[in-house]
A protein has these predicted regions:
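Amphipathic alpha-helical "coupling" segments that flank catalytic cores
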Residues: 1-702
Length: 702
């Protein structure tokens, strides 16, 4: 089959960095879906882009569609014929396919290859649709225009008198199939082979020869259109500039992503500021450079900041002027930060603790000061339940009292990302215990699902109390997430709480529902009249169970997560134990005996589903039942205290039990209606099924 490369370039006014990143992520799927709908085979799809252009190159695109020959499901026979004659439904179906009625047939729906989702049993009218593949060139113009209009942006705009929308006004279009132009019109612009280079270094229009020369032609025009190449070039120059200063740049993926999406040919200029500003906390200086300026900070081998920064610019012309302006802005921003720092130290925690009373956490849940009071009480309860030592408990309460104070500081008001960090700095300056100061900073951890947890008990206690308070309060007043909307980040808070409970060593024995009930007591005066603590615990538990399922699934597999969650109603109560069971189960899930265990688990629950679980015994001379008794007793003994005996030991024991039970099921009539011992046998097997569930629901391991 003949193939050619395809190029589409959309030139636009400057796109924000987030628009570029989002479009580059979406383009390959958009193109792949459109080509699949057109029955056009293709090779690799490459999304390229800068602030001034979005492009896609498709390798090895077929020049001709594949032929179509498919079976098409029509209306049910009962709707297609009446009194042996075709109805309008049958005629419409034939017209849709473009075939005469006598070329349609009636078949059993179960034998069809083109079944519909949720198709009901019965006989259906079917036909075949055939179509010769057409030339790709005749189809691509419209398809590419549709792709242009489907690119998602956080905010799209219209301009002029047109109806098309895009992230920014479109300036030019290039569409080439091989070396030949594709006729494409989008947003009132007709495509050609004329592209544009760097706005300042190569502003003249030039012709693109083909998709295969596109990247190199733009490179010569001072545009690195491949984002990966642009990023590597940029960071190579950043690294070289930092080394020239005798240091290294402070790693920051946000700055890498942001600057790579803000430039077409990135260059680095080195700026500096007064060394006196280095008296400010390291995090403040980095925040100033990082925030509006998007500069990289530089540090020496001892991780001490140097009085320099590295700015990414889109042109290397006249660097002295660029540095002069950048230095002036950096100095002004650092001067403001120094003023905030000195003023904050004058007033300190007593004043902030009063001011947070004027900051609303949520109109239905009170102020931040009220939230802090709840965190303090809940921290005391967690410290008690976790049985930490007296010093840790004392420091946890002290940290809880101060954990949100810096929200009222001038510095955090200007740099919200420094919440907690400034609290630590001010606490140390005020002579607070280092453990308390660190907890003020670390109680915000983990921020994301994969971020580090607080390392010490003090911070972990306050972090858990904060998350549980937020979860309980929002659910108690009816602010649970709906669909994809989660304005109060309850999913993130829940995941953080579950990770703390499952990964922090002193929290393994804490029960999730106990914490929710302890937190709920502080909201009784705010809760809706028709909501009690049991309803709140139930709603939060259902919500948290799904989050726990996801956490377990990420570490093991979806099947293992389903098996562990379904196996025990208490999985959520002690997430650490659930995680341990899942990890042990994952180690053996691929072994041959697991399939036997899955089948046995399913049959056990099937034959005994209506029987009450009872650990019966039988006469020793009753060979059939005594064998079952022995196996169930083995199951019971190996799973009764899994924390002591170990899950892996129980699984090792269960391997033999599963095989023997499988044999018994194959050789014995378990539910014998003529055997007077059948009811007791079923109750015993029901008990065996409950023993299996102590580990997991093996029937879920499909």
């Amino acid at each position: 089959m003949s193939t050619l490369p395809l190029l589409l370039e959309i030139g636009a006014e400057e796109l924000p960095s987030s628009f570029v990143d989002g479009a580059l992520a979406a383009l390959p799927k958009l193109v792949e879906g459109k080509l699949a709908a057109l029955r056009l085979s293709h090779g690799a799809i490459h999304a390229l882009g800068t602030p001034r252009r979005l492009a896609v190159i498709v390798e090895g695109l077929a020049t001709t569609q594949s032929d179509l020959d498919e079976e098409v499901l029509g209306p049910p026979e009962t709707a297609a014929f009446k009194d042996g004659k075709p109805t309008k439904a049958a005629e419409a179906f034939a017209a849709k396919l473009g075939v005469p009625l006598d070329q349609l047939s009636v078949v059993d729906g179960d034998t069809m290859t083109s079944k519909k989702p949720n198709q009901k049993p019965g006989r259906y009218l079917v036909g075949r649709r055939s179509e010769k593949g057409g030339a790709a060139r005749e189809l691509l113009g419209r398809a590419l225009a549709e792709i242009c209009g489907a690119i998602p942006f956080r905010k799209s705009m219209r301009w002029g008198t047109g109806e098309a929308t895009f992230g920014r006004p479109v300036q030019w279009l290039v569409a080439l199939f091989g070396k030949d132009p594709i006729d494409l019109i989008f947003a009132g612009i007709r495509s050609a082979r004329l592209s544009r280079g760097h706005r300042f270094l190569a502003p003249a229009q030039f012709e693109i020869e083909s998709a295969t020369t596109y990247v190199e032609q733009l490179r010569k025009a001072h545009v690195l259109v491949d984002r990966k190449e642009r990023e590597e070039t940029m960071m190579g120059r950043v690294d070289a500039a930092a080394k020239a200063l005798g240091g290294s740049f402070v790693p920051d993926q946000y700055l890498v992503d942001e600057n790579a999406s803000l430039t077409e040919e990135p260059h680095v200029v080195t700026g500096s500021f007064d060394r006196a500003f280095l008296e400010l906390p390291r995090e403040v200086i980095i925040a100033v450079a990082r925030g509006h300026q998007k500069y990289f900070s530089v540090e020496d081998a001892q991780k001490n900041l140097l009085p320099n920064y590295l700015a990414i610019v889109n042109t290397a012309s006249n660097p002295a002027n660029i540095v002069k302006g950048n230095d002036r802005v950096m100095t002004a921003r650092l001067s403001d930060a120094r003023f905030f720092f000195e003023e904050d130290k004058k007033h300190g925690f007593p004043r902030w603790n009063e001011k947070i009373g004027t900051i609303v956490f949520h109109v239905r849940l009170g102020s931040v000061k009220e939230k802090v009071a709840r965190i303090v009480k809940l921290s005391a309860e967690i410290a008690k339940l976790a049985k930490v030592d007296e010093t840790t408990a004392k420091n946890a309460l002290a940290a809880a009292e101060l954990c949100k104070s810096d929200l009222a500081s001038l510095m955090v008001g200007e740099f919200p990302e420094l919440q907690g960090t400034m609290g630590q700095a001010y606490a140390l300056a005020d002579g607070k215990d280092p453990a308390v100061a660190s907890a003020i900073r670390d109680h915000y951890k983990p921020v994301g699902a994969d971020d580090d947890l607080p390392k010490d008990d003090v911070a972990a206690i306050v972090a858990l109390a904060d998350r549980i308070d937020t979860l309980t309060g929002c659910f108690a007043v009816g602010l649970a997430p709906t669909g994809s909307a989660d304005p109060y980040a309850l999913r993130r808070n829940c995941i953080a709480a579950l990770r703390l409970l499952s990964e922090h060593p002193h929290f393994e024995s804490l029960r999730f529902s106990d914490l929710i009930r302890a937190a709920y007591k502080q909201f009784e005066w705010k809760k809706p009249a028709d909501l009690d603590d049991t309803a709140t615990v139930t709603k939060i538990s259902e919500f948290a169970t799904e989050r726990l399922r996801g956490l377990i699934g990420n570490k093991t597999s979806t099947a293992v997560a389903d098996a562990v969650i379904a196996g025990s109603d208490s999985a959520l109560e002690q997430p650490a134990f659930a995680m341990m069971k899942a990890a042990s189960l994952q180690k053996v899930v691929g072994e041959p005996w697991i399939e036997t265990a899955r089948a046995v688990g399913k049959r056990l629950r099937g034959v005994s589903k209506d029987a009450k679980p009872e650990n019966h015994d039988f006469a020793k001379d009753d060979a059939k039942n005594s064998r079952i008794v022995s196996l169930v007793h083995t199951l019971d003994a190996s799973t009764r205290d899994l924390r002591t005996t170990g899950v892996e030991a129980a699984l090792l024991s269960f391997e033999n039990v599963a095989k023997e039970l499988g044999t018994i099921f194959d050789e014995t009539l378990i539910n014998d209606p003529n055997d007077p011992l059948t009811p007791k046998r079923l109750e015993l097997l029901s008990y065996g099924a409950s023993c299996m569930l102590r580990i997991a629901d093996f029937s879920r391991l499909a």
